[in-house]
């Protein structure tokens, strides 16, 4: 039986800001821009009590919480803290699969400490994180990745929960499918149209039905409905793509305004790449219009991109190719694909460096 831990930092960006600035402690904080077209990147738990959430337009957030304090993001600091946390994980296991700067899967079945009880390992890791970074973490412990992820949400903030093989299937059956990890809003809505509201409803559907209506994801849904998830914790896992998108509160017609909206998307994409230690060669821009039609444009370079500015420059050039817009723009997206890990990127760059010398 595997022992999987999912560690998730509590309100990570906002908590770092409250840690570093005592005046922010106990107050509603949003990491992001207060500008009219700004977006909340993260919200403290004090802000969440007013309904403030990440990805929410700043105007909406300020309306819900008039005393909300906006703090500009410091991604270099968040990355440094994330590396401290990653080092703590490495004291316990080599099987670490980071999902972002603030969460990761750990397989502690065979761990470096020789500890047998996964809940004790999770508790010790959380204590170490608190001692070294001053931040709180929550954790979920189970026998597979899906249930560990679900468990980490049960006792947030600053808590942990375990889902055992005995209670796993029953837990899944009562869970609303919209809360399933891997089921986004569009998929949940599609499931609802088929009368699938809970895990029990999902379990009642055959593998053939799920494959027919949900494609490759059908087999995954069939398994997790039964508490089964065979995915391994993979330290070397490379995602096929990393993307970010934003739906605007007011549609855009102006190219300069639209181009300005690309920067936060490029920043988000690159910071996810840094967390995964990957880069990519193909930049894609998605433009969704007010009538819900969309256009995509891509550009592939010989070498992986190296930083926010390179993503932004490519995305801006691609966006310009669909201007004048045929309708006003309601959503923009930026995706980086053809991903490689850092070592592969260095190997590709080395021949050019040799030639230059």
From Swiss-Prot:
Keyword terms of this UniProt record: Cytoplasm, DNA damage, DNA repair, DNA replication, DNA-binding, DNA-directed DNA polymerase, Magnesium, Metal-binding, Mutator protein, Nucleotidyltransferase, Plasmid, Transferase
GO CC terms, sorted: cytosol
Active-site feature positions: 103
Named cofactor requirement(s): Mg(2+)
E.C. designation(s): 2.7.7.7
Residues that bind Mg(2+): 8, 102
Keyword Magnesium: yes
Entries under SUPFAM superfamilies matching the protein: DNA/RNA polymerases (SSF56672), Lesion bypass DNA polymerase (Y-family), little finger domain (SSF100879)
Cofactor comment: Binds 2 magnesium ions per subunit.
Any matching Pfam family: IMS
Site positions (Substrate discrimination): 13
BP GO terms, sorted: DNA-templated DNA replication; error-prone translesion synthesis; SOS response
Claim: Cytoplasm is one of the keywords in the record: yes
Record's function text: Poorly processive, error-prone DNA polymerase involved in untargeted mutagenesis. Copies undamaged DNA at stalled replication forks, which arise in vivo from mismatched or misaligned primer ends. These misaligned primers can be extended by PolIV. Exhibits no 3'-5' exonuclease (proofreading) activity. May be involved in translesional synthesis, in conjunction with the beta clamp from PolIII.
PANTHER family reported for this sequence: DNA POLYMERASE KAPPA (PTHR11076:SF33), DNA REPAIR POLYMERASE UMUC / TRANSFERASE FAMILY MEMBER (PTHR11076)
Similarity-based family: Belongs to the DNA polymerase type-Y family.
Entry protein name: DNA polymerase IV 2
Organism: Agrobacterium fabrum (strain C58 / ATCC 33970)
